[in-house]
Amino acid sequence: MTEPVYKRILLKLSGEALMGDQGAGIDAEILKRLATEIDELCQAGVEVGLVIGGGNIVRGAEKASEGLDRVTGDHMGMLATVINALAMQDALENLGRPVRVMSALKINQVCEDYIRRRAVRHLEKGRVVVFAAGTGNPFFTTDSAASLRAIEIGADLLIKATKVDGVYSADPVKNPEAKFYTRLTYDEALDQRLNVMDTTALVLCRDYKMPLRVMNVFRQGAVMRLIRGDDIGSLLVTG
């Protein structure tokens, strides 16, 4: 069996990835499938950190546009990510995989506080670490949280798992002529305003030379093939 190319990864999942076709909430079958794939990565010797968005439950920015205070909306979004993190923890533990949920907000009755050194130690012991509550601050996306945590834990690769195959010059659903990028620099993505991650997340990755792979989470086994060395999705690097 081919040895994994990456020893430690940070996998960013959108909250929408968990809801399937339901429109909201968590699809139990999709949750189980994603947990199974993550467990297989661990069995292959990869240390896995996770950041899961909360868009399947609530989006703070959207609530703000509806009249809710932005900070309050963002705090609601952070709590939504904790709900998703606990669901993933349960799904992984049902497979026998040890997991720790670490929150940027203090919720000691349900998860640990985020402490970088402790998180790294959990990873070294083969535990999946799910980083919840974003950065713990309003106005920052979970994409920014994923970039930050990937840098902090010294991940070899940040993977953004999406519903599309990678980075395009435009929405491929709306524009069949959209160009697919197999590789590009962060500066190119920023200059062209490509819809990859928000500016803060991209600049963090660029400045700290964190490679980012954007790929389709719904192609079963794709993450494992990537870890084994296949060229899947789009790769973003510091120029």
From Swiss-Prot:
It catalyses: UMP + ATP = UDP + ADP. One of its GO terms (molecular function) is UMP kinase activity. SUPFAM superfamilies: Carbamate kinase-like (SSF53633). It comes from Methylococcus capsulatus (strain ATCC 33009 / NCIMB 11132 / Bath). This is Uridylate kinase. Homohexamer. UMP binds at G54, D74, T135, G136, N137, P138, F139, F140, T141, T142. CDD domains: AAK_UMPK-PyrH-Ec. Its EC number is 2.7.4.22. Pathway: Pyrimidine metabolism; CTP biosynthesis via de novo pathway; UDP from UMP (UMPK route): step 1/1. GO terms for biological process: 'de novo' CTP biosynthetic process; UDP biosynthetic process. Belongs to the UMP kinase family. Residues 20-25 are annotated as: Involved in allosteric activation by GTP.
